[in-house]
Amino acid sequence: MRATRVLLNSAKKSSIAANLPIEMYPLFAAMGVAVASGCFFTYRHFAHDKELRLWKNANLSNLDNVLNAEVHKNEAGNKDEKKEENKD
């Protein structure tokens, strides 16, 4: 008796590692090291860079000054308009 192709193929595909060539193992190791070092150095840059202001030293940013200047400018403009209306 001869086995059908379906039975032969199912017997061959029982293990996923059997389909993976041994030459690929160094590639996987190198890619793992590259991804791990990329994550490490990115974290180190974000966490310890003194010139990068993400969370720390937020008061050094000029954003509050710019936003407050716009608010003060609008308030001053509204006061001038009210004074002109009162003069009429």
Swiss-Prot record:
It is found in: Membrane. Belongs to the UPF0495 family. GO terms for cellular component: membrane. It comes from Debaryomyces hansenii (strain ATCC 36239 / CBS 767 / BCRC 21394 / JCM 1990 / NBRC 0083 / IGC 2968) (Yeast). The keyword Secreted does not apply. It holds the Pfam family B12D. Signal peptide: none annotated. This is UPF0495 protein DEHA2C16280g. The chain crosses the membrane at residues 25-47. Keywords: Membrane, Transmembrane, Transmembrane helix. The lineage of its organism: Eukaryota, Fungi, Dikarya, Ascomycota, Saccharomycotina. Its main location: membrane. One of its GO terms (biological process) is negative regulation of protein-containing complex assembly. The keyword Transferase does not apply. It is a single-pass membrane protein.
